[in-house]
């Protein structure tokens, strides 16, 4: 089952290195790029380039380059017409060998804001106009779990990985491009690094195709966490999602003061201690469809039929959150 993301949310899962792909719709102020991965045990360096074009030797508007070389540091620079500019350096290393990380680039009007594992790390002033950037390049001593472009527009023409995960590229036999009226939708503004417990209002209630995106980190000592789709006025819970670390992913509903029958069967549990996750929950006509890290996790048939009354999202437990969009 192919994962089809909502417009404005462009993920690629488990991409191979070197990663060299277009940025959907091009880079613009207000966009964010999320990179989740793991630094290799023998890591010496890696880089992320915001490039002006796809060719080798293309200008690089922003070069981000962590280096483990005895003087652990991160180097920042810009390349124009084959010449590197003046380096900026920060003698601090936010990455740990053998550890998972989340690296976020937020495109601000005056600079790129770099956030690592939820902590602000650096601001790099624009030397080239943001609108010139067309491609993202990543390579080096790391493993990639996912790359997400948030807030941009879909590319005018499809390319492999643009609207589906790599296992279902747009050019695959039997692939039918989704129609706009069948695409999932996100209606609320994104919230960055919200505190846990989190409570968010689902303005207008749940509707068919509405998709909720939750990106977070499972704490190393985690036991479980909870996501509830709730009716604020009655306390009914249309979907209670309870990942239990090292066990299973429990689903249930709470109606008229009573819990229903638990559902526990999943092919795999994607929530491990010390790992990042990317969760997509889509409301359908007769069920919720849930994807984790781009892979179908489970369906949950509606027990609470008046799902349009669901107006509250609750998240609590042994996690931190980096991004929620409802």
Curated annotation (Swiss-Prot):
GO terms for molecular function: carbohydrate binding; galactoside binding. A beta-D-galactoside binds at residues 259-265. It holds the Pfam family Gal-bind_lectin. Residues 19-150, 198-326 form the Galectin domain. InterPro entries: ConA-like_dom_sf, Galectin-like, Galectin_CRD. It comes from the Eukaryota. PROSITE patterns: GALECTIN. Keywords: Lectin, Repeat. Signal peptide: none annotated. Disulfide bonds: none annotated. GO terms for biological process: antibacterial peptide biosynthetic process; defense response to bacterium. Epithelial cells of the embryonic and adult gastrointestinal tract. Expressed at about equal levels in colon and small intestine but much less in stomach. Galectin that binds lactose and a related range of sugars. Monomer. Contains two homologous but distinct carbohydrate-binding domains. This is Galectin-4.
